[in-house]
Design a protein with these regions (language model features):
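Residue-level structural signal for beta-strand termini and adjacent loop
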Residues: 2-4, 31, 54
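The catalytic Nudix box helix
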Residues: 43-76
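Hydrophobic "anchor" residues
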Residues: 24-27
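Short, catalytically relevant binding-site loops at active-site mouths
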Residues: 32-34, 48-49
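Short, His- and charge-rich active-site/binding loops that engage polyanionic ligands
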Residues: 9, 30-32, 38
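A structural signal for short, well-ordered beta-strand segments
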Residues: 16, 44, 97-99
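Nudix hydrolase/Nudix homology domain
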Residues: 1-2, 34, 39, 77-147
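Acidic, metal-coordinating catalytic segment for phosphate/diphosphate chemistry
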Residues: 1-15, 21
């Protein structure tokens, strides 16, 4: 996102938490070339495109970043949170989704420009990454990991 927004203007982003029936979650590691939070763990997500509904954006982002098609997975929209950065031109709403499905690792096709690895993590492993300050948005999305 390179566009600066005025105070009171927001853009829409989405996050897609993808879990397996065994209670583990797919998390990816950000490439070290990222300007912000390189090497941190995260879930798939990104900005909605012009004219795109939130639900369309999360399906697209998960597919682009992981290769997974979550259209027929259990779950869906969970909650929205707002982030404001006054004077920085970076205000946004985040729609958080959770999908649960069987995942065969051969179905994963990571977007190499964005990710440098993945793991299926337990909630405790995710909490440990967060405690180290290495899990993006954890405090805002932690309830999405409660199944």
């Amino acid at each position: 996102n390179d566009e600066c927004l005025k105070d009171g203007e927001y853009h829409l982003t989405v996050l897609g938490v993808v879990g397996r029936p065994d209670g583990t979650f797919l998390i990816t590691k950000r490439v070290m070339t990222k300007a912000w939070a390189p090497g941190w763990w995260e879930v798939s997500g990104g900005a909605a495109q012009a004219g795109e509904e939130s639900c369309e954006a999360v399906l697209r982002e998960v597919k682009e970043e992981t290769g997974l098609d979550v259209r027929n997975a259990e779950g869906g929209y969970l909650f929205t949170y707002k982030r404001e950065n006054p004077g920085e031109g970076d205000n946004y709403f985040v729609d958080v989704y959770r999908f649960v499905m069987d995942i065969d690792e051969s179905d994963l096709h990571l977007q190499t420009e964005e990710t440098d690895g993945y793991m299926f993590a337990t909630v405790d492993e995710i909490k440990a990454f967060a405690a180290e300050g290495k899990f993006l948005h954890y405090d805002s999305i932690k309830k999405a990991f409660e199944m």
